[in-house]
């Protein structure tokens, strides 16, 4: 219901904005450079994707006019292209941008057919981040082209006038130089008025701009033709930069970025009475600095729901902390700023920290600028120690020393003296411990399975979040479906949980009944077991011959113990295997005692990626253990000898052949 309500408010706002910022039709700006397109070049069409070839992309910017001119041109080469590229779509922010179309045409047989009719252009509210509770007010101007045919060329151009005033006139952008599909012609132009300078830095390319001096301006141009597609490999780390580009920034250093940020997140502000009362309540109830931090953090995480209205300047400017407190919602910057203000009012040093959740430590190679970031968290100092917290993660529990913080690697802490990025130490002490007990009373009836799992750190946060947002029925069904992949005749009996606020440990206990645990093969009963948890969370990239790194879940620390209680004594061989390389470790141990067989696994990733020069050694270490992981129990009723247990290479192949890329079985906590 809240989402529908705010969607309605946003819709109303956008309708009003759309009426005052409807797309216009007009002439091209006088300052652009006219470039010719070679429509006849088809040399790379065979490498094109989605049924169309990109003939031209150009972007020209006038900083003095705060205007961006765009031209695109594609050739439809198949019926799939007719489906995929028969519309013109432009996104703009009506709060500060005016969209003007200059030309929309279909070129067929050398004849241009005009398609620019404002009456047919629909302005649509399109909230792509709605599922993440982010509302930015952007509109989408869409024209559905009629009578598009194979072989047609679609060409259109438009301008967006107006920069986001939150940046106070300063410019920052990234110009891409290569894409996953071929591009015949690429052109960038930047006009910088006199008295202003830009910093330029290339990534993965050595292209240099053509620089010209004009009266009152400096003009930079980048041109490139016949750009081949850059094909990437699967499971790349988010921070790995694949595509070459040119970074542009008017910010000369991080101090200038800090000065900009300080104006948005001032330290000394007046807090409303209701918020002051809440702060006083926390101080009175909690007598130590640590407990006050814990109480304030829990309030902001759990009682201030995550939702952002990020239209216009509010893409970066937070709402007043008092307003956030009263309305009980805010996005990452608003929740972080509120927490900082509350802690500062208690005399605790707390500062907001800008983060890039995707590129992380790669920011060290970027030009300084406020658009380098997509998230905000908090750094707190108690005594001589720093603590990092993410207020957008709900339901974190435990002592502040044990509360997990994502592996963001580096950030920009907004203080009076900040002049550089700050490296963030890795802080994750959590792990998952699972014990699966199979009670098999006889060789014919029903077996019982009891699964006890303790989660700590971020694993506890994620599991706690799932239980808070799903019914016990849904969780039990999901857990049962997990084991049903191994045991078809399994039924779920019950699921109970325990949550320790003091330690932050979350415990689940699952109870199952399994019919037909044993399969019959030529008079011999068989039952197979493997590391169910580790096997399920690990996946293998398709591209094993790597020239790019591949990602691993990090952190990832799991211990799994399988206890099999049997109706009679069993012959079983004990064994132990240790695998260790620069990226991960796996320890597996098998032992037996009278009527019991024990399987024990420890798995941990040491980092979030494997570099290409490490891949060969990585796979070699996996292959060493392909005969020691899985266990098969066999029982021959016709023989008098004891039943036996043995390793099964099939299961180790399944397990270790996929010991690479980990996908969490629980949803990570909310947050931008």
Question: In which residue ranges do the predicted regions lie?
Answer:
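Sec-dependent N-terminal signal peptides
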Residues: 4-13
């Amino acid at each position: 219901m809240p989402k529908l309500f705010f969607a309605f408010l946003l819709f109303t706002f956008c309708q009003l904005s759309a009426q005052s910022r409807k797309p216009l039709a007009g002439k091209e700006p006088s300052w652009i450079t006219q470039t010719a397109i070679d429509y006849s070049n088809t040399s790379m069409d065979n490498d094109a994707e989605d049924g169309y070839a990109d003939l031209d992309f150009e972007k020209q910017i006038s900083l003095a006019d705060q205007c961006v001119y765009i031209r695109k041109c594609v050739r439809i080469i198949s019926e799939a292209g007719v489906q995929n590229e028969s519309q013109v779509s432009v996104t703009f922010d009506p709060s500060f941008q005016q969209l003007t179309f200059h030309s929309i045409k279909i070129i067929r047989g050398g004849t241009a057919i005009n398609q620019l009719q404002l009456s047919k252009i629909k302005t649509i509210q399109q909230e792509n981040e709605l599922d993440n509770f982010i509302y930015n007010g952007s509109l989408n101007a869409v024209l559905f082209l009629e009578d598009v045919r194979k072989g047609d060329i679609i060409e259109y151009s438009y301008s967006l006038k107006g920069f986001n005033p939150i940046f106070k006139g300063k410019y920052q952008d990234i110009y891409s130089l290569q894409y996953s599909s071929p591009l015949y012609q690429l052109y960038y132009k930047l006009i910088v008025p006199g008295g202003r300078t830009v910093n330029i830095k290339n990534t993965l390319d050595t292209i240099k701009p053509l620089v010209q001096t004009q009266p009152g301006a400096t003009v930079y141009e980048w041109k490139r033709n016949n750009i081949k597609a850059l094909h990437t490999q699967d499971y790349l780390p988010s921070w790995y930069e694949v595509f070459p580009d040119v970074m542009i920034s008017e910010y000369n250093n991080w101090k200038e970025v800090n000065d900009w940020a300080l104006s948005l997140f001032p330290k000394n502000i007046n807090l409303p009475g209701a918020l002051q009362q809440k702060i006083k309540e926390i101080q009175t109830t909690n007598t130590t600095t640590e407990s006050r931090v814990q109480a304030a953090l829990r309030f902001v995480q759990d009682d201030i729901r995550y939702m952002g209205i990020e239209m216009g300047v509010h893409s970066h400017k937070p709402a007043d902390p008092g307003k956030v407190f009263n309305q009980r919602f805010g996005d990452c910057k608003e929740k972080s700023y509120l927490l900082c203000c509350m802690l500062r009012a208690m005399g605790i040093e707390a500062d907001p920290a800008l983060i890039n959740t995707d590129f992380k430590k790669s920011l060290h190679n970027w030009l300084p600028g406020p658009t380098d970031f997509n998230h905000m968290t908090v750094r707190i100092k108690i005594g001589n120690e720093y603590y990092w917290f993410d207020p957008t993660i709900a339901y974190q529990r435990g002592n502040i020393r044990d509360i997990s913080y994502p592996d963001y690697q580096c950030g920009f802490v907004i203080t009076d003296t900040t002049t550089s990025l700050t490296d963030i130490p890795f802080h994750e002490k959590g792990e998952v411990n699972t014990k699966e007990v199979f009670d098999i009373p006889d060789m014919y009836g029903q077996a019982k399975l009891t699964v006890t799992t303790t989660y700590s750190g971020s694993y506890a946060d994620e599991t706690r979040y799932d239980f808070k947002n799903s019914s016990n029925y849904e969780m039990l069904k999901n857990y049962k479906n997990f084991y049903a992949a191994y045991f078809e005749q399994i039924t779920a009996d019950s699921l109970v949980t325990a949550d320790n606020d003091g330690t932050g440990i979350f415990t689940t206990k699952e109870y199952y009944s399994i019919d037909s645990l044993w399969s019959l093969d030529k008079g011999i009963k068989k039952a197979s077991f493997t590391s169910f948890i580790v096997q399920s969370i690990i996946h293998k990239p398709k591209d094993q011959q790597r020239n790019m790194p591949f990602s691993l879940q990090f952190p990832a620390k799991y211990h799994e113990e399988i206890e099999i209680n049997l109706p009679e004594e069993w012959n079983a061989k004990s064994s132990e295997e240790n695998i260790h390389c620069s990226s991960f470790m796996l320890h597996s141990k098998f032992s037996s005692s009278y009527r019991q067989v024990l399987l024990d696994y420890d798995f941990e990733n040491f980092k979030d990626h494997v570099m290409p020069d490490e891949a060969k050694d990585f796979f070699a270490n996996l292959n060493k253990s392909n005969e020691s992981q899985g266990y098969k129990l066999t029982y021959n009723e016709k023989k008098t000898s004891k039943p036996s247990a043995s390793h099964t290479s099939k299961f180790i192949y399944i397990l270790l052949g996929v010991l690479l890329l980990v996908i969490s079985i629980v949803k990570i906590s909310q947050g931008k």
